[in-house]
Amino acid sequence: MAAAVATVQRPEAETVEEASNLQWPLPPEHRPSGAATRPGDSEDAPVRPLCKPRGICSRAYFLVLMVFVHLYLGNVLALLLFVHYSNGDESTDPGPQRREQSPQPVPTLGPLTRLEGIKVGYERKVQVVAGRDHFIRTLSLKPLLFEIPGFLSDEECRLIIHLAQMKGLQRSQILPTEEYEEAMSAMQVSQLDLFQLLDQNHDGRLQLREVLAQTRLGNGRWMTPENIQEMYSAIKADPDGDGVLSLQEFSNMDLRDFHKYMRSHKAESNELVRNSHHTWLHQGEGAHHVMRAIRQRVLRLTRLSPEIVEFSEPLQVVRYGEGGHYHAHVDSGPVYPETICSHTKLVANESVPFETSCRYMTVLFYLNNVTGGGETVFPVADNRTYDEMSLIQDDVDLRDTRRHCDKGNLRVKPQQGTAVFWYNYLPDGQGWVGEVDDYSLHGGCLVTRGTKWIANNWINVDPSRARQALFQQEMARLAREGGMDSQPEWALDRAYSDARVEL
């Protein structure tokens, strides 16, 4: 308190000192004898009367007046600022039209985080749930694949299954759309160009395995040597019946007959590329608190920016019944000049014929223990080299998860609550997305007994850094303006999007 009093009293002392230094002319009778006079002072000059101590010209009155003026001006200034910021950038021109806001600069995105594999079998301790340790184990380096047991509790797994059942599941289909066929026609690829694309060994002849390597699906049907030859016979593409097409035979074939044949033949469930049912569960505002908590765990696990994780696809929940499977595929498609990512196409303002899923990471959760089969297979994990043609040797197609799952390099057995995650792209050397990692080829083995439940969290990143930044900026703007329910509207189960993942 003493210090405070001293602080308050200090200006008064200064005022007294300053007042004592004021130079007012004194009447002659009050001047000390011998006092010096300034030029212009004279006895006859009119004498300026002294102000009364409480008069309007006193220093105290002057200080009070200045304080009042400053307070008044401050209030006026504050009022003007309030009006200005309340109206934003409203135009002062008459009329109801609002000035068009200048576009915000697109932010620059930092590098994408990527966990180091170190070596197969390497374990590290992490905390994705407060107060609880989890262990991440490296399963392979090509692709960069990890396993984290106990990521979900048994109760959380059962809840996710329950929520999916309440919403309702639909059959998972992979079918080319009419738009896909129209786009293919619009590209005007000659049959000679198509033949050269399929002819991998450039011997001028199309063997069955060359056709199978590129033509992985028809009307959702998994193509095998048997049904390829059946199609050849139906459309009379192989007159000599040797199962090999020459350039002349291929040129004589009408591709419209091929599409007509595929549309007219309905595939059985065991002949499909995938035999499962699925649904989507959102994880944003308004979702069940467990769903939001899982997203936060994924955020801590991946160490990616919140914007990337939050604006990625909802959680996909999949049920494989007995006999269910998913032949080997990659989760992301390569982006060519003719393609665009599904999630950024709304903001890209580009006209391209094809779209594809751009999934930087896959986080897969096992929601139950499977009685028989149902492993996740990575056929070429940690191979020294990758060659698409080597996937099909003699009668063995490593992509066929119904027949040859046991021949894959790595199989992960479903265990309730365990998560596995991997990167679908190689790094580009500049902290962003590079080429698709061919070693990320994976599939769901045949469920021989019981039912298999899984869930997928896909993290979407556009290989174009600028498009990804624009997408995040636009989604953030929509969220601020209440234009979406915490997430963009995803159209992720379109037939061609799924089909493109397979190509």
From Swiss-Prot:
Modification comment: Glycosylated.
Cofactor: Fe(2+); L-ascorbate
Residues where Ca(2+) 1 binds: 199, 201, 203, 205, 210
Span of domain Fe2OG dioxygenase: 310-461
Topology within the bilayer: Single-pass type II membrane protein
Any one of the GO BP annotations: regulation of erythrocyte differentiation
Protein residues bound to Ca(2+) 2: 238, 240, 242, 249
Cytoplasmic side stretches: 1-61
Protein name (Swiss-Prot/TrEMBL): Transmembrane prolyl 4-hydroxylase
Gene source species: Mus musculus
